[in-house]
A protein has these predicted regions:
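Alpha-helical membrane-protein architecture signal
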Residues: 30, 34-38, 49, 257-267, ...
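Peri-transmembrane interface segments
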Residues: 248-284
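Interfacial "coupling" helices/loops that link adjacent transmembrane helices in transporter permeases
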Residues: 286-334
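Small-residue transmembrane helix packing/gating motifs
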Residues: 83-84, 197-240, 249, 255-258
Length: 401
């Protein structure tokens, strides 16, 4: 908030050099008409900044969301590529996961070597509510776990923890930990391994036996089912058989790793589309602001426009001046908004790094599209004020009637 307020206060000072630099490039092909447009755009820096601020704020938010969405998709792709070794992944809606019957059916398909079922686990550790994962079956060959200490094999009371979590709590292999459940029971577990931080899994992972103990039957669910094919099995045939086995469970999807990444990215895109739709209102408000400011500017400069018309300026030239002024104002707001959006996006990515976001990814294609779109918006916003300016009657304007 402080940075936004600071930008609003600094915008008048920024508008003169930024708009001047833009004008030197954009208006050059238009000769004297272009010079007039550039001069008019920097004549009142406060008005220029105020006009561009709504567009600046809207595009800043769009850029922040775009950076977060692009980074999230890239992070998901990286996590799946480095953490999942399964041939196929069975998934379902987030609200219900994969039905248990579908898991059993998939395990019985010919050509399936082994499976690993991931479950969410919610327990209380030392008075704090914690979230982790449970796995039925060995993660070997299905999930990439880089062990720092101990083993990835989870026995009946096995409990593997991430390196960061182990260091924070002082846990090592052999440490006994107590899980307090929602039913009021206490379940003792023993740390059997410490693995390199893996956001795909979380802070810790327990065996399926412990999952059964700490999770009431009514809340149990399968998040994902990882399937590894028997060596030599035709993967296309296996996929067909898996789809046939899980067909009675309509919500189940059978995907390979690439398809799974695509589906996760599509969910992110859907969320972004909703947010972009809401932010479109800010752009509409910005356009109205530009129209209003240009209209007021035309009224204030009525005598000036009349004088220009009297000495020979044609109506198309008058309209062109207004178009260029609006274009410069819109681009000023867009450029500052995009720069701020990238800066804010970087800050959010750094803050959320522990939640699994990796290296920041900027959607440059989207950024270029926004700048070009802002230029178009600027010209469209100037249509009515430009027509009004061009209709100015020279003699009446000079006489200020």
């Amino acid at each position: 908030v402080a940075l936004i307020v600071a930008t609003a206060l600094a915008a008048p000072s920024l508008s003169r050099p930024v708009v001047g630099a833009l004008g030197a490039v954009i208006t050059r092909p238009f000769g004297a008409i272009g010079r007039l447009a550039r001069t008019n755009s920097v004549r009142n820096p406060r008005r220029t900044a105020a006009t561009a601020f709504a567009l600046m704020l809207g595009l800043m938010l769009v850029t922040v969301i775009g950076v977060l969405g692009s980074t999230a998709k890239a992070s998901v792709d990286s996590l799946v590529d480095t953490g999942v070794e399964a041939d196929y992944i069975l998934s379902g809606p987030q609200s219900i996961g994969v039905p248990t019957g579908a898991t059993t059916a998939a395990q019985q398909v010919a050509g399936v070597d082994r499976t690993a079922v991931l479950h969410p686990v919610f327990v209380t550790i030392a008075g704090q509510e914690e979230y982790g994962a449970a796995i039925d079956g060995s993660p070997e060959g299905l999930l990439e776990l880089s062990m720092v200490q101990g083993t990835a094999d989870l026995d009946s009371d096995g409990f593997s923890v991430s390196e960061t979590e182990a260091a924070a709590r002082g846990w090592t292999v052999g440490t006994e930990v107590t899980f307090d459940t929602v039913d009021g029971a206490s379940v003792p577990v023993t740390v059997t391994g410490v693995f390199t931080d893996n956001p795909l899994i979380g802070n810790w992972i327990v065996s399926g036996d412990i999952y059964q103990e700490v999770t009431p039957s009514i809340t149990r669910s399968d998040i994902l089912v990882l399937v590894k094919a028997t060596p030599g099995t035709d993967l296309d045939t296996l996929r067909t058989d898996l789809e046939a086995a899980t067909k009675p469970f309509v919500v189940v999807q059978v995907q390979d790793v690439e398809e799974f990444k695509g589906s996760q990215g599509q969910q992110i895109d859907t969320l972004l589309a909703v947010l972009y739709g809401l932010l479109a209102l800010a752009v509409v408000i910005a356009v109205l602001g530009i129209v209003n400011t240009l209209a007021l500017s035309v009224v204030e400069r009525r005598r000036e426009i009349g004088m220009l018309r009297a000495i020979g300026m044609q109506r198309p030239q008058v309209r062109r001046i207004i178009y260029l002024e609006s274009l410069l104002i819109a681009l000023f707001g867009a450029i500052v908004g995009v720069v701020l959006g990238i800066a804010f996006g970087w800050g959010f990515v750094q803050t959320l790094r522990d939640e699994g976001l990796g290296t920041m990814t900027v959607p440059w294609g989207q950024v270029v599209s926004m700048l070009l779109g802002s230029a178009v918006v600027g010209v469209l916003a100037a249509l009515w004020p430009a027509v009004r300016a061009a209709r100015t009657k020279p003699l009446e304007a000079i006489a200020d009637l």
